[in-house]
Amino acid sequence: DADIVVLSAPHQANEQMLVRLAKMKSLRNCLILDTGAVKQPIAKLSARLNFGEGTQFLPTHPMAGKEKAGFENSAAKLFVNHSWFIDESVCLTKLNKTKLYWMTKLLGAKPTYIDNPLHDELMSEISHLPQLISTILGGQVNPYLIPLAGPGLRSMLRLAGSPYSVWSEIIEQNKTDIIKALKLFRDNLGKVTRMIETGQPL
């Protein structure tokens, strides 16, 4: 038996595991949650599944992480003072609500309740777009020049080192919102370019 199951693999693996957990009817009174960066697809999947008695799935997304994967890169205080987005539409049992409270409290996270469509839209702007900008910049800069650069460039390139296997799924699952964010950034970049060309102050 398990009190809490946390799915923290890439999105497709999380979805496959969730289906397997739903078939385990002996898994009772368990709180299952994921930590993926896109919420709508897995939330829609969970709505079609029937779990064991008292077992519930809760879409969540902690706003903390590293660009490097693997247990060797783990950190005990990773979640301290960071927001932890939680699907506000799920009505948890009293038992599972207590589990969620103590888990986030012990990790030092800040629970933030939000609906899934708004979450995915926000992530496209404050997480997914910065990732893509970092990746684009990493592909543009001559790698031989990076050791000569200061901390500004290195900070901007940090996200470019994130595993592509994770980000390729995020881009696919949140494609509509990401494209919208990219187009807005493109328009703003065009405005800045024209201002520089015409000598206007930024």
Residue ranges and their predicted role:
Residues A2:
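An anion/phosphate-binding loop that grips the pyrophosphate of nucleotide cofactors and donors
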Residues A76-G161:
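Internal alpha-helical scaffold of NAD(P)-dependent oxidoreductase catalytic cores
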Residues S8-P10, G36, E88:
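Glycine-rich, N-terminal phosphate-binding loop of Rossmann-like dinucleotide-binding domains
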Residues E72-L78, S168-E169:
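Short, flexible, solvent-exposed loop/turn segments with mixed acidic/basic and small polar residues
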Residues Y144-L202:
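Interdomain hinge/lid region at the active-site interface
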Residues A13, M17-E72:
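Rossmann-like NAD(P)(H) cofactor-binding subdomain of soluble oxidoreductases
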Residues V5-V6, L33:
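N-terminal Rossmann-like NAD(P) cofactor-binding module of classical short-chain dehydrogenase/reductase
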